[in-house]
């Protein structure tokens, strides 16, 4: 689990293609990985990756073809800047919101405008995700915990404050940029609960109708 508070900006040092999957080398720059072990998780641009090898300059992680195709990683090249966050500890202050590192879809930056020292960006997200997004709700973009300012169909407006701009790769934002999108897990759990409640209610109603039809109740 992660918080969506970025600890460092790294970059992709190498992409190694195997028969059925890939490995990437991530240069961590100023991220302290002295407490990271092989098998630990690091959110890399919002994707939860498992460290397979530790290097003097960073780490190596494996990507399945599924992860490669379903995230913005398919558009990355060597040198691509990536937001980095180590897995949270029980003692970690939750400054953002709970983030799983399981990307729900790939969005695209369609517009951005300066707003004083901040920046407003508009991101088009996959249509199937729009039902999970609400004004003042949370969303994770490339691993960054952000608050949604407005929702227009499947487009969300976000304001990036100066500190977030300085500490993440959003400082180099551009039109058509592909971004990893993870919805707030609470929204997905709420949908599941509603579906279960609706199913149980319909099932109970159908049973009552059958009992009434056969004269067991009136």
UniProtKB/Swiss-Prot annotation:
UniProt-annotated binding residues for 2,4-dihydroxypteridine 2: 48-50, 62-67, 101-103, 136
Domain of life: Bacteria
Broadest EC class assigned to this enzyme: transferase
Known pathway: Cofactor biosynthesis; riboflavin biosynthesis; riboflavin from 2-hydroxy-3-oxobutyl phosphate and 5-amino-6-(D-ribitylamino)uracil: step 2/2
Pfam family, one: Lum_binding
Reaction equation(s) it catalyzes: 2 6,7-dimethyl-8-(1-D-ribityl)lumazine + H(+) = 5-amino-6-(D-ribitylamino)uracil + riboflavin
Transferase is among the record's keywords: yes
InterPro entries assigned to the protein according to its UniProt record, in alphabetical order: ATP_synth_asu-like_sf, Lumazine-bd, Lumazine-bd_dom, Riboflavin_synthase-like_b-brl
Keyword annotations: Repeat, Riboflavin biosynthesis, Transferase
UniProt GO molecular function: riboflavin synthase activity
Binding site for 2,4-dihydroxypteridine 1: 4-6, 145-147, 159-164
UniProt Lumazine-binding repeat ranges: 1-97, 98-194
Function: Catalyzes the dismutation of two molecules of 6,7-dimethyl-8-ribityllumazine, resulting in the formation of riboflavin and 5-amino-6-(D-ribitylamino)uracil.
Cited NCBIfam families: PRK09289.1 (NF006767), PRK13020.1 (NF009566), ribE (TIGR00187)
Name used for this protein in its record: Riboflavin synthase
Organism: Photobacterium leiognathi
